[in-house]
Curated annotation (Swiss-Prot):
The gene is uvrD. Its EC number is 5.6.2.4. The keyword DNA repair applies. Coiled coil: none annotated. It comes from Mycoplasma pneumoniae (strain ATCC 29342 / M129 / Subtype 1) (Mycoplasmoides pneumoniae). It holds the Pfam family UvrD_C. Residues 296-554 form the UvrD-like helicase C-terminal domain. It catalyses: Couples ATP hydrolysis with the unwinding of duplex DNA by translocating in the 3'-5' direction; ATP + H2O = ADP + phosphate + H(+). Keywords: ATP-binding, DNA damage, DNA repair, DNA replication, DNA-binding, Helicase, Hydrolase, Isomerase, Nucleotide-binding. It comes from the Bacteria. CDD domains: DEXQc_UvrD (cd17932). GO terms for cellular component: cytosol; DNA helicase complex. This is Probable DNA helicase II homolog.
């Protein structure tokens, strides 16, 4: 596909794409075309500098981003060079490196919380929370020279970052988290497992200790291109430095204003480290500020948040990062303060319907963004109760996929731990084995299940219970040994009662491997399944998107609702917690990311009260000049359920629709509504009731208690 750099890139982009050798840093703001810049840089090196694609390495963070980048680059290269293109996530590159260098016998496990569950049984810490702490620590502070973690103080700091104030007040919690790390690493080693952080650690350790290996790989890649550089953690930076050590040609694209992953090890001064390590000159820094995604009115709001960030950081020449757009309309972003959480739900639901019905916006092109996952549940319940807006249903899919992988992992490792998980999933695990394993830690389940007569320490009754489990396990082993993969899948699917959609995905993955590599192993199959999960999480169905702001990074939508912009929620803060400047800047950057996901419509929402207590809007709202930059949707703190409310041509006084006193309702009350008809109260909250209407067309709806149209009835 022909692409003319001189006409199809703007001046800023063109200067970056055609820069010379050495280390070049491109500060590319939200929606300014990062993927375009990297793909065009790749094509420029091939077409103008005659660099073979096999000698260029492009690194990014997600499979989705890598896939999009690869597609763009392949369109710009002759077909005969397609097989030579090297575009990877950090993890997939490390997986390739380890396998090429003889490190083949490992299983990547992205759900290792079970190792911690027993250990933390007596603690109030959750295993997933400890895993976050461990992952951030490993990614940030591994010392390759000593092959050890650098200091306990950093682990304690990460505990401070992730734990609630009540947890942080007790030294016991910190000690538990540190001890859990030791237990976690021991469990992985005993079961021949590695996590994604280990891929990076093993790769960097090998490169740092084997100079011939380092020379081989650093000579191979003449140019290295990096995406989203602001999210780089210490270990990823060390890998980039080593790979670039011979040619020292780096082209790194990122945006410091979108650095939102400090909690998982991203280093805030990584750009400064890069400049110092490679002696980067000012002429090798490029700023890309023309946005191709958002309406200018949305960018005006986003720039006001950037201005706040720059002021708090005392940045000189701070306007360099401000974005501008050629997309202009008379449509302002909207701020709405609902009277309650239920009112917020109602307003969002009605607005989604209005955008879909009257403006032709598909549900898949709208997103509700949340600061945390816990905010999502009540909104999901409200959407389910309404029933008219399609929702993404992915939880069951991924749970079934994880269960299937547990069975396959057991067939590779043959460890007691994995066999137990697999047989429990297959519902053939005899409970008597729990006691047997505790009494005799030398028990080898693999041998017992394949040769029951050797289980002399078990009585006849116990051996009888094992028979069914043994039949299942030995049959699975036979499938693996004889490489009957289709039979293995069919048998496992039937035993697990796997949904057809999950089966189809797994079969497609198997067929892909069979086409690409006839000598693939079951380990390759498992790892490929793990690597492809990111792609599945981006459903193509026409459903509304409910995601956290962190998950929304890199995405864009026609309409965006930012949920719950209230004090203590955004910025996120626990009771009695004091937010320091660095934490506030992290939250401001996250808010900026949320704002810049919207292309046309942006809605900022907060609530007036929750559980009977008045709560204040986030100070982030105050950082925006509302009179000039926001349309204020309402100030009367009432739940608006009328479709007409969203039509600016209507001038009715909505305050007249509400009584001055709340009506007392209890569950089971019979009620009547002027529009929806007869119904029964099924839930009562502070200022609203949920009514199940007899007319199935209306289903269950939340209505403010003192709405004039809602009255008690006897019938």
């Amino acid at each position: 596909m022909a692409f003319n750099i001189s006409t199809q890139l703007n001046k800023e982009q063109r200067a970056a794409v055609t820069c010379g050798k050495g280390v070049n840093i491109v500060y590319s703001g939200a929606g300014t075309g990062k993927t375009t810049i990297i793909s065009q840089r790749f094509a420029y090196l091939f077409n103008q500098k005659r660099i073979n694609p096999s000698n260029i390495l492009a690194l990014t963070y997600t499979r989705k981003a890598a896939s999009e980048m690869k597609q763009r680059i392949l369109e710009l290269l002759p077909e005969k060079y397609h097989k030579d293109v090297n575009i990877y996530t950090f993890h997939s590159f490390c997986s390739r490196f380890l396998r090429e260098e003889g490190q083949k016998n490992f299983v990547i496990d992205d759900d290792l919380s079970n190792f911690l569950k027993d250990f933390l049984k007596e603690s109030e810490l959750k295993s997933q929370k400890v895993l976050q702490i461990i992952d951030g620590f490993k990614n940030a502070y591994f010392d390759f020279d000593t092959n050890s973690l650098k200091d306990d103080e950093r682990l304690v700091e990460l505990c401070e970052f992730h734990l609630d104030p009540q947890e942080r007040n007790f030294q016991l919690f910190k000690e538990t988290a540190i001890a859990a790390f030791v237990e976690y690493e021991k469990g992985k080693q005993q079961n021949n497992k590695i996590d994604f952080a280990d891929l990076l650690i093993k790769t960097c350790t090998l490169l740092s200790k084997d100079h011939k290996l380092l020379r081989k790989w650093s000579k191979k890649f003449q140019y290295i291109l990096g995406d989203e550089f602001q999210d780089t953690n210490q270990i990823q930076y060390e890998l980039i430095k080593m790979l670039a050590s011979h040619h020292q040609n780096l082209f790194l694209v990122g945006d410091n204003n979108q650095m939102i992953y400090r909690w998982r090890g991203a280093v805030s001064d990584i750009i400064d480290s890069l400049k110092s390590d490679f002696k980067v000159r000012p002429e090798n820094e490029f700023y890309i500020t023309q946005n191709y995604r958002c309406d200018q009115n949305i960018l005006t709001v986003a720039n006001s948040i950037l201005g706040t960030i720059y002021a708090k950081e005392n940045q000189p020449d701070s306007t360099k990062g401000f974005l501008f757009s050629a997309i202009k309309s008379n449509r302002l972003p909207v701020y709405f303060q609902a009277s309650s959480v239920e009112g917020q739900h109602s307003w969002i639901i009605n607005k989604i319907k209005n955008l879909h019905k009257n403006h032709g916006i598909q549900y898949k092109d709208m997103a509700i963004l949340f600061r945390t996952n816990r905010n999502m549940d009540s909104m999901t319940e409200a959407l389910e109760a309404d029933g008219s807006i399609p929702l993404k249903q992915n939880k069951g899919f991924f749970k079934q996929l994880e269960t299937f992988k547990k069975v396959l992992v057991a067939l590779i490792t043959r460890s007691n731990y994995d066999i137990k998980l697999a047989l429990k999933s297959l519902r053939v695990w005899p409970n008597v084995l729990n006691k047997s394993l505790t009494v005799n830690e030398q028990v080898n389940l693999d041998k017992i299940l394949q040769n029951l007569e050797q289980a002399i320490f078990l009585d006849e009754h116990t051996r009888g219970e094992l028979t069914e489990a043994a039949k299942v396990f030995t049959r699975l082993i036979k499938f693996v040994e004889e490489q009957q993969f289709e039979a293995l899948l069919a048998f496992t699917f039937e035993a697990l009662n796997t949904d057809q959609f999950v089966c189809n995905f797994i079969f497609r993955t198997l067929q892909k491997l069979q086409t690409e590599n006839k000598n693939f192993t079951i380990t390759d199959f498992i790892n490929e399944l793990r690597f492809q999960q990111d792609e599945l999480k981006q459903s193509k169905d026409n459903v509304i998107n409910l995601i956290t702001v962190h998950s929304a990074k890199g995405l864009e939508f026609e309409a965006v609702f930012i949920y719950g912009i209230n004090q203590d929620n955004f910025p996120l803060k626990s009771k009695n917690q004091i937010i320091d400047l660095q934490r506030e800047l992290d939250e401001l950057r996250l808010f900026y990311v949320a704002l810049t996901r919207a292309k046309k419509y942006l809605f900022l929402l907060s609530v007036y009260q929750m559980s009977g207590e008045i709560i204040y809007p986030s100070k982030f709202i105050r950082f925006i000049n509302k009179e000039d930059r926001l349309e204020i949707a309402t100030i009367n703190h009432k739940v608006h359920q009328d479709d007409e409310f969203f039509d600016s041509s209507k001038t009715e006084d909505y305050q007249k629709k509400y009584l001055t006193e709340n009506t007392d309702f209890v569950n089971g009350d019979s009620v009547s509504h002027r529009t929806y008809g007869k119904g029964v109260v099924v839930e009562v909250r502070e200022d609203a009731v949920c009514v199940a209407f007899k007319n199935s067309k209306y289903g269950q709806r939340w209505i403010v208690k003192n709405h004039r149209d809602l009255v008690k009835a006897v019938y």
